[in-house]
Structures are given as structure tokens and as C-alpha cells.
Design a protein with these regions (language model features):
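Signature of extracytoplasmic/envelope-associated structural regions
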Residues: 1-213
């Protein structure tokens, strides 16, 4: 006997407020029925950790005034993660000399239309794919050997900053490409790409807030 878990996506609206300059009037764009279609977390040396969150909206409208009931009171004092806050792991082993580590989730999302509809009829989702890429200095052949031998790995990224810590873990990951690059007097580098597969009972990616170290 098996069971399935279904998570219903919540929709929301995004209001873009463009301030008028030199006497120009303000403009407002409201996008309704918004659903996130994935994300990409980029971690690189000498940079802040950044995230991209593409989305699809069911409809979009240009307004001449702020929608009734809109409020803009908010307080934001969180401190974003930087490259010095990031540690990458292969299982329990810390990965050394990593320059970049990017984790991408793609749900194969597309907007579907129907005859007679002036807006999106519904948002269709395909099978989610959690992929990654990392690059760094080649100081041994451990990761290259795992690519050549098609060894499954579990990669993690832990970010620990002043406001707390969180982790991204890719379960049952497989390297799909590994490229050593040799050129000039500089260090030999290794670029790796891969995808996490998970199992029918385990997600291919786990994102959580943690206590670290």
C-alpha cells in the first residue's frame, strides 16, 4: 500500500510601483495569480549569495492608482548571506577550494491558454528537476573519479550568518559532466554539472533552517 502527498500551490499578486520623475505621474502594474515556477541559488566567491525566483502570472494590468487597501509598512533588518558564510559538502566531507556552487529548481512550468480567454487559463507543471553546477580548483581526483565511476553523491551547501543558518541538500545526486581545464600558469580548475534524483519516498532536494555549527 502506498500513499501520495499533494501540495497545493498558493497564488498571490505582485504590485510594481514605478515612481514618476521630473513631474511625471507614478505608474502601477499589478500581476495577479502569480505562481513561482522554480528558483536558482547562486553562491560565488567575493559576492553575496543571490537567488532568482521566476514566476508565471495569470493576468497583468496597468493601474493609475494604488489598489484600494494596499499598505506598504514593513521592516527588514535581516543580514543576507555572503560567500564567506557558505560551506559545501560531499556527504560529510567538506569540499575545498570551491569557487561557485549554483543550485537550480525547474518545475517545467508553462502558461496554458484557451480560445476566447484574454488571460492565462491555467498554469501547467511538469516533473521537477533539481540540477546543480560547481567549479573550483582541482586539488585531487576524488570528484572526477566519482563522475567517471557514476557514483551517487549527496551534496550540501550550508550558509551560516548573523541571522541564522540554512542548508540545501541534494539527495541521490549524479554527476552528468566533469571538465578539467588546464591553461597557462594558473591553477587547474574542475567544472562539474549534475542532477539530484531522490527516490519515490524521498525528495531530491531538502531545504531547511538549521543550527550550525
Amino acid at each position: 500500500m502506498g500513499s501520495e502527498m499533494c501540495i497545493r500551490d498558493r497564488t498571490f499578486s505582485i504590485l510594481t510601483w514605478m515612481k514618476g520623475r521630473c513631474g511625471g505621474a507614478d505608474s502601477f502594474i499589478v500581476t495577479r495569480g502569480v505562481e513561482f515556477s522554480g528558483f536558482s541559488i547562486e553562491q560565488a566567491v567575493n559576492a553575496m549569495v543571490t537567488g532568482s525566483f521566476p514566476f508565471i502570472g495569470l493576468s497583468q494590468e496597468i493601474l493609475t492608482a494604488v489598489p484600494a487597501g494596499s499598505t506598504f509598512n514593513f521592516s527588514f533588518d535581516a543580514q543576507p548571506f555572503a560567500s564567506v558564510d557558505v560551506t559545501a559538502f560531499d556527504g560529510a566531507a567538506k569540499l575545498e577550494l570551491i569557487d561557485t556552487f549554483t543550485i537550480t529548481n525547474d518545475n517545467g512550468t508553462s502558461a496554458q491558454f484557451a480560445l476566447g480567454d484574454a488571460s492565462v487559463a491555467f498554469v501547467e507543471r511538469g516533473r521537477a528537476a533539481n540540477t546543480f553546477s560547481l567549479a573550483g580548483k582541482l586539488y585531487d581526483t576524488v570528484l572526477l573519479d566519482k563522475f567517471l565511476n557514476e557514483t551517487q553523491v549527496e551534496l550540501s551547501s550550508i550558509m551560516s550568518g548573523p541571522s541564522g543558518a540554512m542548508s540545501f541538500t541534494l539527495k541521490r545526486a549524479q554527476f552528468t559532466a566533469a571538465t578539467p581545464e588546464i591553461g597557462g600558469p594558473e591553477s587547474i580548475t574542475l567544472s562539474i554539472e549534475g542532477q539530484a534524483t531522490g527516490t519515490p519516498l524521498q525528495s531530491s532536494i531538502v531545504i531547511q533552517r538549521i543550527a550550525y555549527p
